[in-house]
Amino acid sequence: MTTQRHYSPIDRLLLQADAAMRTLLPFSGQPYRPSPAIVQPDVQMSDEDIRHVAGLMRINHTGEVCAQALYQGQALTAKLPQVREAMEHAAEEEIDHLVWCEQRIHQLGSHTSVLNPLFYGMSFGIGAVAGLISDKVSLGFVAATEHQVCKHLNEHLEQLPAEDEKSRAILEQMRIDEEHHAESALEAGGFRFPAPVKFGMSLLAKVMTKSTYRI
């Protein structure tokens, strides 16, 4: 029989600080799975295509920074232990996406967004508030967020140059994982958000995508 470890409030704050550092510091996280891009060939692309792909991958990287913060904020305030554990497990899986995107960005000779700390803080706060309201709302927010991420991934897959199989392999695996996270959150009892709430979330997402494409 397994025993569940109980953390003090100070312990949890230290864990959150550690998670933030691992998310925001370059190459500080290690993926649990190797990047899908490894087995894909290196190809020559025009400077314009390289800049565009780097911008898309920067958006996706910041999206994963937000996902990390969202899950950590929810884990901090989740009421049921099993929900807290689910959030922490999902955050671990998202580390793969975070590192894959960062690796690809650097391969393209570019940089991650300087706005990541700002978006991390905002997302952490949103996640913590959602967790305080109820676990049902918290899980529903995960599902709605992941569906929004899948929408962006589909759009980015359409914009990638045909020859860029490395970025494509990463985004396709990310889409599979995000769809699974969304369905798992709903199956666990997540609230299905109404259309107006989803619309508001999409507007916030546009702010993130427009700003991080270049910086």
Curated annotation (Swiss-Prot):
The cofactor named in the record is:
Fe cation
The cofactor note from the UniProt entry for this protein is:
Binds 2 iron ions per subunit.
Q: Where in the cell is it found?
A: Cell membrane
Gene3D superfamilies membership: 1.20.1260.10
Q: Which Pfam families match?
A: COQ7
Q: Does the keyword Phosphoprotein apply?
A: no
Which pathway is recorded for this entry?
Answer: Cofactor biosynthesis; ubiquinone biosynthesis
Which keywords does this chain's UniProt record carry? Answer: Cell membrane, Iron, Membrane, Metal-binding, Monooxygenase, Oxidoreductase, Ubiquinone biosynthesis
Q: Which residues bind Fe cation 2?
A: E94, E146, E178, H181
Q: Which terms in the Gene Ontology molecular function aspect does this entry carry?
A: 3-demethoxyubiquinol 3-hydroxylase activity; metal ion binding
This entry's Enzyme Commission designation comes to: 1.14.99.60
Look up the record and report any one GO term of the cellular component aspect.
plasma membrane
HAMAP family referenced in this protein's UniProt entry, alphabetically: COQ7
Q: What exactly does this protein do?
A: Catalyzes the hydroxylation of 2-nonaprenyl-3-methyl-6-methoxy-1,4-benzoquinol during ubiquinone biosynthesis.
Q: What is this protein called?
A: 3-demethoxyubiquinol 3-hydroxylase
- Origin organism is Pseudomonas fluorescens (strain Pf0-1)
